[in-house]
Design a protein with these regions (language model features):
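ATP/NTP phosphate-donor binding region
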Residues: 1-48
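Structural motif
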Residues: 54-55
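Conserved beta-strand scaffold positions in the cores of enzyme catalytic domains, especially
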Residues: 21-25, 83, 125, 199-201
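Predominant activation on well-ordered alpha-helical scaffold segments within soluble catalytic domains
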Residues: 4, 40-43, 47, 69, ...
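Short Gly/Thr/Asp-enriched flexible loops that form oxyanion-binding sites at enzyme active sites
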Residues: 58-81
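Short helix-terminating capping/connector loops at secondary-structure junctions
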Residues: 15-18, 79, 116-120
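Accessory alpha-helical/coil subdomains and C-terminal extensions
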Residues: 1-15, 133-202
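Internal gly/pro-rich beta-alpha loop/helix module
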Residues: 86-171
Length: 202
């Protein structure tokens, strides 16, 4: 609702009345406070609404957007529809916000290449001009609109006047979707292992 208020032309830029949009609020908190419980609730909301929509878009704060992209990638088992996660560097309603642009880009990717059936599938991040696998989202800057990049692999595609998808990278992304993993554990730690590390510490 806030995006439409600040940018009434958003839907007309992405298909207008041909696109039906419904909103579900899973939580409203600073993304720095996102936890595995929220990931479970978000994944559950996606599953509950999965059959009713052609694509699902998640709006998320940037601090932990990459973590949520990875969590959803492993929590959702072999999704055949696009689950697109995006956010903004500048909040909606402030001057020079990129919120409307990123949502427009997310919709364009979700319906790519146009027509009745999207060829995009699985969890992807859309931010600035980059389309990134959900497992590869890394925030690299707090200042530029292209805030996220794909680490250890290239982006699936780029967005400009057209949505340009690398078909080989998209095919590889789709082949990586099936996981069937359990919900994420709620007690986690990141341990950096060095020579002579005592395993009893873990």
């Amino acid at each position: 609702a806030s995006v439409k208020r600040h940018n009434p032309g958003l839907l007309s830029n992405t298909g207008g009345s041909r696109i039906r949009v419904e909103l579900r609020e899973v939580c409203n908190l600073d993304s720095s406070n996102i936890s595995p419980i929220v990931w479970e609730n978000l994944a559950g909301t996606i599953r509950d609404n999965y059959d009713d929509f052609d694509a699902l878009i998640v709006l998320h704060g940037t601090n932990t957007l990459g973590y949520t992209g990875a969590a959803l990638s492993f929590a959702l088992v072999n999704p055949t529809k696009p689950v697109v996660i995006t956010g903004s560097q500048v909040p909606s309603g402030l001057p020079a916000t990129d919120a409307a642009m990123n949502i427009e880009h997310a919709v364009r990717v979700a319906v790519w290449p146009g027509g009745d059936i999207s060829r995009m599938a699985g969890v992807v991040g859309v931010f600035g001009s980059h389309i990134i696998p959900g497992t590869r989202l890394k925030k690299t800057t707090s200042f530029d609109y292209d805030a996220f990049r794909s680490f250890s692999s290239e982006s699936i595609g780029r967005i400009g006047r057209l949505v340009n998808i690398d078909e080989d990278k998209l095919s590889k992304h789709k082949s990586y979707l099936h996981t069937g993993l359990n919900p994420p554990a709620r007690r986690q730690a990141d341990l950096r292992v060095e020579p002579e590390f005592d395993a009893r510490i873990a």
